Amino acid sequence: MIRTTFATAIAHFHTHSHGGAQARPLQNNTREVIHCPEAWLVKIVSTLFVYRVPDSDLCFCYLSKNLNPFISFEVVKKLDNNPHIGFRFWEFSRFKLNIRHSFWTYNLLTRSLCKAGLHDLAGQMFECMKSDGVSPNNRLLGFLVSSFAEKGKLHFATALLLQSFEVEGCCMVVNSLLNTLVKLDRVEDAMKLFDEHLRFQSCNDTKTFNILIRGLCGVGKAEKALELLGVMSGFGCEPDIVTYNTLIQGFCKSNELNKASEMFKDVKSGSVCSPDVVTYTSMISGYCKAGKMREASSLLDDMLRLGIYPTNVTFNVLVDGYAKAGEMLTAEEIRGKMISFGCFPDVVTFTSLIDGYCRVGQVSQGFRLWEEMNARGMFPNAFTYSILINALCNENRLLKARELLGQLASKDIIPQPFMYNPVIDGFCKAGKVNEANVIVEEMEKKKCKPDKITFTILIIGHCMKGRMFEAVSIFHKMVAIGCSPDKITVSSLLSCLLKAGMAKEAYHLNQIARKGQSNNVVPLETKTANATLAAC
């Protein structure tokens, strides 16, 4: 059938491409206008390879005469939504028909294969590309090294990187790989790559160092990042404002405000570069997190004097800082000031204010802001809900808290354990463990898995009600799903079992904890364990 169809299609192709007595205009009811004869061939070949690799002499002979690199590229492009079939065509045309494919065919198909997760096939194509004498450009190499690194194939990505040193603009390739590794939290791999392969190359630029500094600061290694700043000039690279902003943020994150402040002063002096809104916002954020609101406010005044206008982020940082410090009047003043600068309060602003009011016991004011948010058409996020739920539980308003939990689905908010845990804890402390169990069932139905805190709350709650067998059952479920109990969980359960005269169960439970020690299941402390054994 396929052979007959192909023969008919070939005849049709020749009719329109070579003219003669058989050639005639297309009818008015034809669905597709054929602009050139090659389009027919592209369509025929694409359709043919969707079903099978041609194996008849007729197909082979015809394709060997009429396929060329241009038509081959068009076929690959038509099959772009199915790269596996595109690879099948490329493999057939290269090895059976000796088609020398263009860079654009290799570029398109290797990208499509990677996007489909077919990295092994993409790797094969890349090797053939090199053996065919087709050189990749820096954009393709940059894409490939990032894609292979994301797939976990760092060895191949590194091999591609080493080849890029021969390509103009290799900095782009280097930075693509380093950036991918940092995004994947593989900062050690990024630094190892730099130390082993990049220190002795000329393909590093300021962006290279900025990526590494960002990665190190992100994992709390601001001091190590500072060392990179010191060696940049040796590579012919000068730090820019992004470099300094990243370091300031890193030191603030590590609670090293003195070092952040020193670097801020260097930038402010103009000896290295001029500060921008990110510089000031980073430093303000550091002071706010440390509770130094006077210094943070002073920096806001300073940046305004210099004509550096704050953004929503700047104001939100200040609102959050004052709210956490319990200075709600000042927090509200900042909200008013941000409007005067054309920065309008958003969900982050309101969430910080709600958190502040709940912290000082003014939950009703928090709900007034909640209503204001809804009136403005703002959608509360998971943190907004969590703050109010926790505040309600602290006031033993458990039914209202549960009502808020019920709104999550209608608001398209993905439920998280930290939203449910305060409510479960509240019902357990009130002795209503059955209600707590129902809530856990509800969260599991919503694909929200209980975490270590959830299980610990349930275990202690059941113990306090004397429901020891249920508590032990919850413990076994916790271990079975790979959630490792901590010392509080284990010691609380064992203590309750011993008090209930269930020494044998306590012994077996502690043995389970010891067996799971290598998997981070924490056994009972030795002294208590000995008491358990003695009781047995």
Curated annotation (Swiss-Prot):
Alphabetized UniProt keyword annotations: Repeat
Source domain of life: Eukaryota
Family, similarity comment: Belongs to the PPR family. P subfamily.
Name the record gives this protein: Pentatricopeptide repeat-containing protein At2g06000
Residue ranges that the Swiss-Prot or TrEMBL entry lists as coiled coil: none
PPR repeat start and end residues: 102-136, 137-167, 170-200, 205-239, 240-274, 276-310, 311-345, 346-380, 381-415, 416-450, 451-485, 486-523
InterPro entries reported for this sequence: Mito_RNA_Proc_CCM1, Pentatricopeptide_rpt, TPR-like_helical_dom_sf
Organism: Arabidopsis thaliana
Keyword Repeat carried by entry: yes
